[in-house]
């Protein structure tokens, strides 16, 4: 997990995560900070193990840490900004070209339904990470009732 720690300590990662924190200050709905990124990583890794997908742990964690980073640049349409930021950060953290391509491909489509492989588990983990069952703002949430996580799954 040395490369994951390099991402976490990368100056650009820190700078953008601070921006996201400022943008979300006072937000009553789900946040997109490090806690969310780590929740997504852990859930995605559990899914990976349960479904015997054999996706490398560091690839899952790197994708999870970077998937929402673009919110610090363009909050609403963040996926492509996340890709651009990941392209700057990953080489500095010893990810090779093939790994970087795999990660940025997953980030670019992580919000789409019915993905498979890495992007699929990131998308599922992203949704499953939401603690709707414990949210004080659930009554005004924009999510449809059938999308809410009303039970603990992971």
What would you call each of these model-derived segments?
Residues 1-154:
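Metal-dependent phosphohydrolase cores
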């Amino acid at each position: 997990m040395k490369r994951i720690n390099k991402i976490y300590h990368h100056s650009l990662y820190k700078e953008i995560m601070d921006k996201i924190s400022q943008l979300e200050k006072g937000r009553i709905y789900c946040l997109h900070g490090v806690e969310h990124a780590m929740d997504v990583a852990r859930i995605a890794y559990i899914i990976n193990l349960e479904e015997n997908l054999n996706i490398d742990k560091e690839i899952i964690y790197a994708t999870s840490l970077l998937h929402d980073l673009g919110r610090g640049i363009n909050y609403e349409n963040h996926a492509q900004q996340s890709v651009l930021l990941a392209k700057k950060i990953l080489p500095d953290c010893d990810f090779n070209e093939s790994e970087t391509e795999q990660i940025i491909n997953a980030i670019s489509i992580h919000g789409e339904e019915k993905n498979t492989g890495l992007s699929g588990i990131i998308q599922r983990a992203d949704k499953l990470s939401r603690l709707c069952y414990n949210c004080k703002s659930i009554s005004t949430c924009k999510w449809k009732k059938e999308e809410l996580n009303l039970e603990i799954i992971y």
